[in-house]
Curated annotation (Swiss-Prot):
Pfam families: SOR_SNZ. SUPFAM superfamilies: Ribulose-phoshate binding barrel (SSF51366). InterPro entries: Aldolase_TIM (IPR013785), PdxS/SNZ (IPR001852), PdxS/SNZ_N (IPR033755), RibuloseP-bd_barrel (IPR011060). D-glyceraldehyde 3-phosphate binds at residue 167. The active site is at 83 (schiff-base intermediate with d-ribose 5-phosphate). This is Probable pyridoxal 5'-phosphate synthase subunit PDX1. Pathway: Cofactor biosynthesis; pyridoxal 5'-phosphate biosynthesis. Belongs to the PdxS/SNZ family.
């Protein structure tokens, strides 16, 4: 790896580190973006439909209109992220050209390539990608991802899959930390991950990039749960702006992530939030409805 590429990778991972301990909120217009910023969000994710609406409306979900993203960029001073379809490197080129701060190669959108993910190391802008386990996370990092998030099951309001993916990841990290050098080679082959990244995880006891929770986080308690399980921050999608009082819920989730180990504050911020999003239990989804299975 050349020094130039390595430096770029380090810079991008460093930019993602700056979001650690924060909440990233899905927004569909400038007004929502301003609400998110006022509530204390560390970044916003600009998209035309939140995941719950993508589920309900069906059809092909694509990159958002660049003009909408530009309106959100103009409305706030915090970083603006946007989603592209898995494998759609031209959508990524477009988003980079308009100056988005991070790109999410997202399973929430309809995949453009069912075999290949984007070669993210070619881009200057940092990428975030979803994963269900250590193998998926390290494959995305090897492609150039600067940030990982759980896939969870977006648009459901059910946190169970995000919990499952986080516990899976933490368990695998504990396992590699206890392995001998020769066992690491075998395990790297088993999970189809580069050995240098597996070794780095063994040394660090964690991923070499930040790892956020995403998919089904709908309440302050959900957010605090994911932080206590070891996540570095939280993405909240449909759970805020499909709830009864979005501004209050947004503030509450930000405080919950900051004070995730303080039950008294968590109780305080959980009071009188209005109705949570109705949601849908993951157990009621048919296999074809599950978004987390997209990608490899």
């Amino acid at each position: 790896m050349s020094a130039e590429i390595k430096g770029s990778t380090q810079v991008k991972a460093g930019l993602a580190q700056m979001l650690k301990g924060g909440v990233i909120m899905d927004v569909v217009n400038a007004e929502q973006a301003r609400i998110a910023e006022a509530a204390g969000a560390c970044a916003v994710m600009a998209l035309e439909r939140v995941p719950a609406d993508i589920r309900a409306q069906g059809g092909v979900a694509r990159m958002s209109d660049p003009s909408m993203i530009k309106e959100i960029q103009a409305a706030v001073s915090i970083p603006v992220m946007a989603k592209v379809r898995i494998g759609h490197f031209v959508e990524a080129q477009i988003l980079e050209s308009i100056g988005v701060d991070y790109i999410d190669e997202s399973e929430v959108l309809t995949p453009a390539d069912d075999i290949n993910h984007i070669e993210k190391s070619k881009f200057t802008v940092p990428f975030v990608c979803g994963s269900r386990n250590l193998g998926e996370a390290l494959r995305r990092i090897s492609e150039g991802a600067a940030m990982i998030r759980t896939k969870g099951e977006a648009g459901t309001g059910d946190v169970v899959e995000a919990v499952r993916h986080t516990r899976q990841m933490q368990g695998e990290l504990r396992r590699v930390k206890s392995m001998s050098p020769d066992e690491l080679y075998t395990y790297a082959k088993e999970i189809a991950a580069p050995i240098d990244l597996v070794k780095e995880c063994a040394q660090l006891g964690r991923l070499p990039v930040v790892n956020f929770a995403a998919g089904g986080v709908a309440t302050p308690a959900d957010a605090a749960l994911m932080m206590q399980l070891g996540c570095d921050g939280v993405f909240v999608g449909s759970g805020i702006f499909l709830s009864g009082d979005p501004a209050k819920r947004a503030r509450a989730i930000v405080r919950a992530v900051t004070h995730y180990n303080d039950p008294k504050i968590l109780a305080e911020v959980s009071e009188n939030l209005g109705a949570a999003m109705v949601g849908r239990s993951v157990s009621s989804l048919e296999e074809k409805e599950k978004l987390a299975t997209r990608g490899w």
